């Protein structure tokens, strides 16, 4: 993959001195509202969502190589980033139409790659739901959509991070044993599709290829994959792309995510970092709602710091530089 000079400079801004992307993800919108709603009766306000993102940016970006935010509630937080931290901005609308299984992609109406760049971002991030076994008609529509964004990012000379969330149109519960059995095929298949240079993607943000909660040794209940089978899926995922790729934390606990990264590394996955969200900051939501800004800062300086510090230590021994893939 040939990077332009500008894209390379921006990717270096997003990663640490070893070429590892240790990014903090806080572009959650719908998911954040749901988290907040667990701790208060009234609807979460824009001001609350903006302030919490500012607090997390202010307290934790000194320990992250970069931060992913959304232009809807995250712009005030972009001003609170540590000077050394890079910035990614999300380009997609939150959620999807639940009345259909299509999960069509949709850009934020008043944003473009140009506007994201003008806001000071070092990369454009777009989230795509993709079922590799959907109709060719639907998947061609999704592929064309990603081609447009890739072309925009080429025009603006800004890195394009595609986040792929695999799913099955026929299985509603992504946490089920039924879905766990097909997840490796779904995740790896989608990754292969979007490793085609025609999409002009620079970094893939992907799920791990198994539901770790069903892996032998991690599972508390039913086992879907032996350790050997799971390891083979991590290796197959690594071989599915020539692009730099990073893992998303998918809402699991900090400890489980760290253990997953160790397992991935031991399985031969040469991943290039993470975009870690709720696994790092989720506990600050309750502290903020119940006891306000000072309590949230205290949580972020203690438990939040521990989460990100432990994650960074794990990354230094498990992740590899994206420069080895470009």
UniProtKB/Swiss-Prot annotation:
InterPro entries: Aldolase_TIM (IPR013785), DeoC/FbaB/LacD_aldolase (IPR002915), LacD_aldolase (IPR050552), Tag_1.6-dipho_adolase (IPR005927). Gene3D superfamilies: Aldolase class I (3.20.20.70). Pathway: Carbohydrate metabolism; D-tagatose 6-phosphate degradation; D-glyceraldehyde 3-phosphate and glycerone phosphate from D-tagatose 6-phosphate: step 2/2. Its EC number is 4.1.2.40. It catalyses: D-tagatofuranose 1,6-bisphosphate = D-glyceraldehyde 3-phosphate + dihydroxyacetone phosphate. One of its GO terms (molecular function) is tagatose-6-phosphate kinase activity. It is an enzyme of class 4 (lyase). Disulfide bonds: none annotated. SUPFAM superfamilies: Aldolase. One of its GO terms (biological process) is D-tagatose 6-phosphate catabolic process. NCBIfam families: lacD, PRK04161.1, PRK12399.1, PRK12858.1. Belongs to the aldolase LacD family. This is Tagatose 1,6-diphosphate aldolase. The lineage of its organism: Bacteria, Bacillati, Bacillota, Bacilli, Lactobacillales. The gene is lacD.
């Amino acid at each position: 993959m040939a990077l332009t000079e500008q894209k390379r400079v921006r990717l270096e801004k997003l990663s640490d001195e070893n070429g590892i992307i240790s990014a903090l993800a806080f572009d959650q919108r719908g998911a954040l509202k749901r988290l907040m709603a667990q701790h208060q009766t009234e609807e979460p306000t824009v001001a609350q969502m903006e302030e919490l993102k500012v607090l997390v940016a202010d307290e934790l970006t000194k320990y992250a190589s970069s931060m992913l935010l959304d232009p809807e509630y995250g712009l005030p937080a972009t001003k609170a980033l540590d000077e050394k931290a890079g910035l990614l901005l999300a380009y997609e609308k939150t959620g999807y139409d639940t009345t259909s299984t299509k999960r069509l992609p949709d850009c934020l109406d008043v944003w473009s790659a140009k506007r994201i760049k003008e806001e000071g971002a070092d990369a454009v991030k777009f989230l795509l739901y993709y079922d590799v076994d959907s109709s060719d008609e639907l998947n061609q529509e999704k592929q064309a959509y990603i081609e447009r964004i890739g072309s925009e990012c080429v025009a603006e000379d800004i890195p394009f991070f595609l986040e792929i969330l695999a799913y099955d149109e026929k299985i509603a519960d992504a946490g089920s044993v039924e879905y766990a059995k097909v997840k490796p095929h779904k995740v790896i298949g989608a990754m292969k599709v979007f490793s085609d240079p025609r999409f002009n993607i620079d970094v893939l943000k992907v799920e791990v290829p198994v539901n770790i909660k069903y892996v032998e040794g991690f599972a508390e209940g039913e086992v879907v994959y032996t350790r050997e089978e799971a390891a083979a899926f991590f290796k197959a995922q690594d071989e599915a792309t020539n692009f730099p790729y990073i893992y998303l934390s998918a809402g699991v606990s900090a400890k489980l995510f760290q253990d997953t990264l160790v397992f991935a590394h031991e399985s031969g996955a040469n991943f290039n970092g993470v975009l870690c969200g709720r696994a790092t900051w989720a506990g600050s939501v309750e502290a903020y709602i119940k006891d306000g800004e000072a309590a949230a800062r205290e949580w972020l300086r203690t438990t939040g710091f521990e989460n990100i510090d432990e994650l960074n230590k794990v990354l230094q021994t498990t992740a590899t530089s994206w420069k080895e893939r470009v």
